[in-house]
Amino acid sequence: MNGSNLRRGTFTILLALCATPWVGTAQALVMGIALGLLQANPWPRQTARYSKMLLQASVVGLGFGLSLGEVIQTGKDSIWYSVIGISCTLLVGYGLGKLFKTGTNTSALISFGTAICGGSAIAAMAPVLKAKSDETAVALATVFTLNSAALLLFPLVGHWLQLDQNTFGVWSGLAIHDTSSVVGATSAYGATALAIGTTVKLTRAIWIAPVVMAASLIKGGEQQARIPLFIIGFLGAAAIRTLLPSYEHFWGELAGVAKQCLVVTLFLVGAGLSREVVKQVGIRPLVQAVSLWVLVSALTLVALKLPWSA
């Protein structure tokens, strides 16, 4: 068997394993990262495309596990954290970019990705800033690298600090960049954390549209942004479950399938972390991104533990 066939065979076997209940989110991510860093992913472009599609479908499926009332209440409870968090993250990110002398566009993209929704936010903001392809790529690679770290670190920190599932879910939803990493970290922590974290994260993601439009007006451009369709799908799924409670068992089965699809998604996400992606990041953007992420994570957790959040 030549090297190409061996890579394909290994990838296919591990992918199939991730579709079974025997593999959890953390194991799937580690297997994917190992493949990516060992240059053993035979289909990097297809992996990137299908991981995004599968993630969006999985998030919609998770909506069948929640009532619309739960979604609305969680969104209402976290909205001010989202508004304050986004504003402070953008301001601190701007300051850190100046401090570390990161390129203006790269710094802005990293800050925007950290504040709202990782790669989706970066992709939406890049045309507004007229960012070059290499600036966008560096910002995406930086956020992607930290997403992978968050999947492993957040559950460890949560258990170490003995956070309850509600606090961990809100913290993850507010402090982790991408939706995939939020659902991965929270699903490893518990069902309640997953439900809360996903809803809080999607509440943050809705802010892509108004923030991009505001930036476009400031820049004098015509770039528009729309709320991602999978967020509407998530709300629609929760509405269907609420309107048709007699099929609750079926909706629960759909939500269970969605959770297993998330395991497959995280394997694909990990497999996309190649050596080229790591090399592309560079020291200044990485230092800015890590500093911003640590500050946001720490301050968010402190805010959640203060008396007013009880």
Curated annotation (Swiss-Prot):
Gene Ontology cellular component terms for the protein in this record: plasma membrane
Topology in membrane: Multi-pass membrane protein
Pfam families: Cons_hypoth698
Transmembrane regions listed in the UniProt entry: 11-33, 53-72, 79-97, 107-129, 136-158, 193-215, 227-244, 254-273, 286-308
Compartments (UniProt record): Cell membrane
Annotated InterPro entries: UPF0324_pro
Predominant place of localization: membrane
PANTHER family per UniProt: INNER MEMBRANE PROTEIN YEIH-RELATED, UPF0324 MEMBRANE PROTEIN FN0533
UniProt record similarity statement: Belongs to the UPF0324 family.
Protein name per the record: UPF0324 membrane protein GSU2818
